[in-house]
Amino acid sequence: MAHVIDFKEAGFDSVLDELEWRGLISQSTDRDRLAHTLNGEPVHYYCGFDPTAPSLHIGNLVQLIIMRHLQEAGHHPIALVGGATGLIGDPRQSGERILNPKDIVEQWCERLRIQIGGILEQEGSNPVTFVSNYDWTATMNVLDFLRDIGKNFRVGTMISKDIVARRLNSEEGISFTEFSYQVLQGNDYLYLYDHYDCVLELGGSDQWGNLTSGLDLIHKVRGVNVNVMASPIITDANGKKFGKSEGNAVWLDPNMLSVYKFYQFWLNRPDVEMASLLKAFTFLPKAEIERLVEATDTNPGAREAQRVLAWEVTSLVHGDEPTRKAIDASASLFGRGGDLADIDLETLESVLDGLKVENEAGEKVFAQALPGDRIAQAGVSAGLFKSISEARKTIKSGGVYVNNVRVEDEEQLLGDGDFLKGRFVVLRRGKKALGVVARS
């Protein structure tokens, strides 16, 4: 697994200094008070994760990494999984969320707990504490909620929150359900303050309005100043919100995004993003990150920083062994590593998924073939050649490979043993052009 170190080993005077250097703080409550809080005795802090999907994504990973930094510094993490707020849904930039059934929310809550537990320490002297806001929200009746909590919220302040104001001015407006979300989140912080002496809440900067609702509530009803710390919305080299792959979120669940594709996402990041991503998504010390950034400038072709980044993040999320399999599969695909036949079917399917071709209906599918088909025809079907004559010519010149074995005869047929796991044949033209056919 990726090596996790605390701020002292990383060469910083405090964990707050390190988080700032890594670009993980965009705004916070009073900085001096926050520094005093984090530089003193260990405190409880929390971050909430709503089950709006069956998996967390790399936007959530930023929060988990911040939580792990604070945990390594000795502070006590509380991971709140939104069993109650997940039934309500926080306001989005546009459109109401679809409310999921309670049983689905419960299932997703459990899946999120497993993912969170894979990043944060669950054993030892400072394990993460898991809570669900359903436990204290479901038992509160409407009258108590309005008298004890709602009384402390001013509607004028609530409608001035950025997302709420935007939704109010839109055609679809905002429901009372989503409008009330910030009150529920504020009550969460109050509950955790009362029962765990929690004095710091974490979240993304796009949630600043919701984050400060608890801050204000605690000040009003307990007369105490607590803290909020928000991370920036990380963007890519083009200024777009980071973490989208072909329009889809980069999920942490390997059943929603394979380990191989997750690894490739990080491996394919451009040079210009290396400094910010190594700081934000790895626990590497400052000196090592600076060395990797310098290596990118002096020898970009080696892509050392990308390989280190991909290893560190993938092994952190998925573990060492699955990450090694993803790396080995990638190398085997181009004949630079082990035997393709040694790759398990799940990894093989994931590796080859990007080699699908478009059918007449515009769908991405595997090209089809059977034992006894000519390799030249298979190459055309897989999109490596425009014609059979072109395929034969390339075979004759020694430039075509089946499962990394050079094809010697332009009339050669596919054999039953050529189908890896009885399913796939990997075709290669030259050093880099790949194609695949699947048994029909």
UniProtKB/Swiss-Prot annotation:
Chain span(s) of sequence motif 'KMSKS' region: 241-245
A biological process term (GO) from this entry: tyrosyl-tRNA aminoacylation
Chain span(s) of sequence motif 'HIGH' region: 51-60
Compartments (UniProt record): Cytoplasm
Amino-acid positions noted as binding ATP in the UniProt annotation, renumbered to this chain: K244
Gene3D superfamilies on file: HUPs (3.40.50.620), RNA-binding S4 domain (3.10.290.10), Tyrosyl-Transfer RNA Synthetase (1.10.240.10)
A GO MF term: tyrosine-tRNA ligase activity
Superkingdom classification of source: Bacteria
Keyword RNA-binding included in the entry's annotation: yes
Entry annotated with the keyword Repeat: no
Domain S4 RNA-binding residue range list: 373-430
Entry EC number(s): 6.1.1.1
Main location group: cytoplasm
Pfam families according to UniProt: SYY_C-terminal (PF22421), tRNA-synt_1b (PF00579)
Subunit structure as annotated in this protein's UniProt entry: Homodimer.
Functional note: Catalyzes the attachment of tyrosine to tRNA(Tyr) in a two-step reaction: tyrosine is first activated by ATP to form Tyr-AMP and then transferred to the acceptor end of tRNA(Tyr).
Assigned protein family: Belongs to the class-I aminoacyl-tRNA synthetase family. TyrS type 1 subfamily.
UniProt name for this protein: Tyrosine--tRNA ligase
Organism: Bifidobacterium animalis subsp. lactis (strain AD011)
